[in-house]
């Protein structure tokens, strides 16, 4: 059994019902929209974000559940899907999860409007049911995701990202949505504010570890879904590179920056950069940082009694840092 399927076992029934509710939440009177959303549902991913909502809700309430939890999971998945559709337009990407992206099939104009539609459906699902606490959590995430993306674009132009700014970017771009999932899971079953914020922090730590793992893939010798060196080719300043720039000599620093700025499409130079980062401790340092965040997430779970839901969250943490793709 695949790790994600193993993690899903305690909430298998909830996830199956969620899929039906999620489909219903996207329905429209416009036939074109229904064709597109049907296409989106058919090419679903691992659905890790709804899994976080359900597992946290069950863990903090001793297996309890609420209709609000389904709505919270649907809101999260609607917002997440909207951001993916918009991301593909921004990145001019023609593929998503092995399928053609929405913009590849229906062009950018329709893709942007579909993303807007999904975003509005998510917000209205909360408003119509007066789930204002859940709406606030997801709205904070949407704001931070936009800020993180723009901060990265601003800093990428000069390649002057410090480690502090790097962590702020990945916290906003990646971790904030997982934090919202965990916070929404707790809030949906009536957990107190302290627990909601603790679960948000738990999700944030996992999200940061998740993104750091993604950064490490760029330097991996193993064959994975993501091509080696793609971040360097796209001039993305990731933690292994940032740490190496902070610890090497001025001469080496100039060579590194010049390589990323002007020779990022030269395969030989990209390989040289990867080798230099590896030889100068960039991978070891980054792996240590990833494990630091993993341990912070584990420390939060220690506050909760043993349960199948807690076990799945522990497995989720391991999966995030040990996954091959």
Whereabouts are the PLM-identified features?
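All-alpha prenyltransferase/terpene-synthase fold signal
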Residues: 1-325
């Amino acid at each position: 059994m695949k790790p994600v399927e193993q993690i899903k076992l305690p909430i298998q029934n909830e996830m199956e019902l969620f899929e039906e509710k999620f489909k219903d939440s996207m329905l429209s009177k416009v036939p074109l929209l229904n064709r597109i959303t049907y296409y989106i549902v058919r090419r679903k991913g691992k659905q890790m974000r709804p899994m976080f909502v359900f597992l946290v809700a069950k863990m903090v309430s001793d297996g309890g559940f609420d209709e609000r939890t389904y709505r919270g999971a649907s809101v999260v998945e609607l917002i997440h899907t909207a951001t993916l559709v918009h991301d593909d337009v921004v990145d001019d990407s023609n593929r998503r999860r092995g399928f053609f992206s929405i913009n590849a099939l229906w062009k950018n104009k329709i893709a942007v409007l579909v993303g807007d539609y999904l975003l509005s459906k998510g917000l209205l699902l909360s408003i119509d049911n007066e789930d204002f606490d859940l709406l606030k959590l997801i709205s904070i995430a949407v704001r931070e995701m936009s800020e993180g993306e723009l901060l990265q674009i601003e800093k990428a132009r000069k390649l002057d990202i410090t480690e502090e700014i790097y962590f702020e970017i990945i916290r906003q771009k990646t971790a904030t949505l997982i934090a919202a999932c965990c916070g929404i899971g707790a809030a949906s079953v009536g957990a107190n504010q302290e627990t909601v914020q603790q679960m948000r922090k738990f999700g944030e730590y996992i999200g940061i570890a998740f993104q750091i793992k993604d950064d490490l893939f760029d330097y991996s010798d193993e064959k994975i879904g993501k091509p080696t060196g793609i971040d360097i080719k796209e001039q993305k300043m990731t933690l292994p590179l940032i740490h190496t720039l902070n610890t090497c000599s001025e001469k080496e620093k100039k060579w590194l920056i010049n390589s990323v700025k002007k020779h990022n499409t030269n395969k030989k130079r990209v390989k040289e950069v990867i080798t230099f980062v590896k030889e100068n401790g960039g991978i070891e340092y980054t792996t240590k940082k990833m494990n630091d965040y993993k341990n912070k997430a584990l420390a939060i779970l220690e506050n909760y009694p043993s349960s199948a839901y807690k076990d799945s969250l522990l497995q989720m943490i391991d999966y995030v840092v040990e996954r091959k793709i």
